[in-house]
């Protein structure tokens, strides 16, 4: 069963984060989808499509739409893949957002996912965008507080 929402409840947000963590651990991915509609051009447009099976969230489509060129991310629990859940989510997205002025849809994913699922692009009839984002990271290094004279640490309430 698919439910479309323009905003996630606390429980749905918790379920979504759990599903994202599971998919990331399985796929070796790191980028988390945006789980708010705060920046979407129309706050009434559905931005979250949740696929439940026997009361468990097994699929999620998120929409980031700060303008009419929207980005979607689709996540399906590893144990429920290749069962049409992603397509059902995308079909629901197309139907539910048909009345909104969407100009284009871009699928967001990571290189490692495409390498592990080489048929994904062709199966969906997609064209890879060469203008992809590059995410850089750096390991954190501890900063001894005693040596930072311009820093005051307070406990939050």
Predicted regions and their residues:
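A short, internal acetyl-CoA/4′-phosphopantetheine-binding micro-motif in the GNAT/acyltransferase core
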Residues: 73-83
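Conserved beta-hairpin
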Residues: 46-59, 154
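Conserved active-site tyrosine of GNAT-family acetyltransferases
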Residues: 117-122, 126
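Conserved acetyl-CoA-binding loop-helix of GNAT-fold acetyltransferases
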Residues: 82-95
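Conserved catalytic-core motifs of GNAT/GCN5-like acyltransferases
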Residues: 108-110, 125-141
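Conserved GNAT acetyl-CoA-binding A-motif
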Residues: 69, 95-112, 120
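Short amphipathic alpha-helix that is part of the acyltransferase structural core
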Residues: 1-35, 136, 142-157
